[in-house]
């Protein structure tokens, strides 16, 4: 009703007003930001296991031990204020300086799949850039999200920062997310989630950093180290039960080495479905599937569930040690073309690497998100990287390497492919300001 909408708007306005009072934070300098970020990292380390287990209990998704790894990754490898860069030009006409400035208030939307990791990551990046943040968490993860934000605020005040620099909507809904995204007090949106929430953010007139879905393909050619490929594909695709958008979702393997790849996947924790078992899996996890090269409709009950539980549901016993369900399927099978977000990995045989790359580009659906290849041929790496045009491209490792887990570089849990920022970082959440001093400050 209009009364409920008005009340919701007033409540959010009061919260934003509280944040506005903290904008003195913008005057506190970089040293305080460094201190705050360091203290946030310390407190999050202390509560890492607690938050991981709480997220697992509340959402019912993924694996608690993998959530510990996710949280540890963002705690340690999200960039801080050191990511901000200034530029200076001097010449006969004086000096010009550009500096990264805060936007003010960030309106952030976070998913149920990675609730604490996304909040920690977004907070470190946003505060490093000098911003305040208002979160609208996923309703299915509201308790752990509120608890995480309380701990973060305690860390901020411990470091000498203002109280309630980071706040959240206490009872998040789709409607409260829409209110936040359209509120005049919010200067920039940071949205991490599925296609629905990304499209809602596109409808606003605000600057938006939008991290949407993906369907990351893997290509394995005849030159690949097949033991490495099998091990890394299982490691990546089974991580937190395939909840991360960067996790591997389908494999295209050159037919001459397909059997050896499947053997390696089984040796490293996979369970290869028999033909009769594949039909049972389809009926379990799909509510609708055409197997004509189009996406299926997924039964949400099985999203983020353990491979052993999925196998038990089709009558496979004593499979609790299996991390990944592996399905040998034709290229038009709906598993290939669907972002399942569960540990079920379709593997399709193709005649050569050219066909594998062609299909990988199609299966990625133009999300420009993530892809990977296993090959010893540098030309294949180069060609696929160019043709698939994704934000994260990984060669010869699990796609987790692209997030800094098993690879170099910083991490982010907001991969903004739709809007082009890629891995979101503090400089993504700042605006450039320029100072020009004509005829002065030139010392040579």
Where are the language model's segments positioned?
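Single conserved hydrophobic/aromatic residue that forms the stacking wall/gate
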Residues: 2-20
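Structural signal for hydrophobic packing residues in well-ordered secondary-structure cores
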Residues: 22, 26-29, 40-48, 52-55, ...
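Flexible, glycine/charged-enriched surface loops at secondary-structure junctions
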Residues: 27-31, 162-166, 241-245, 271-282, ...
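Long amphipathic alpha-helix in the N-terminal Rossmann-like dinucleotide-binding domain
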Residues: 41-91
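Rossmann-like NAD(P) dinucleotide-binding subdomain of oxidoreductase/dehydrogenase enzymes
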Residues: 86-228
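ALDH superfamily catalytic-core signature
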Residues: 120, 147, 198-325, 330-331
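Conserved C-terminal structural/oligomerization subdomain of aldehyde/semialdehyde dehydrogenase
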Residues: 316-444
